């Protein structure tokens, strides 16, 4: 998932259980990834840095960039 300066791309991702998802900061600003439910959270990621999470259980996971979430930088992963 690309972390751009104001959004995640794609914003919604559907995957099978057992998938490793990687976010890559492709923007020019610092970003982070944090699940609403607290199940995962990255450190601050500088441009070019990445963060990965294995999704082993079915469910819907909402997440946000703690720096730009109020500007709409939010996403969703649906695991089946």
Give each language-model segment a name:
Residues 1-80:
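Extracytoplasmic copper-binding redox domains, predominantly the cupredoxin/blue-copper superfamily
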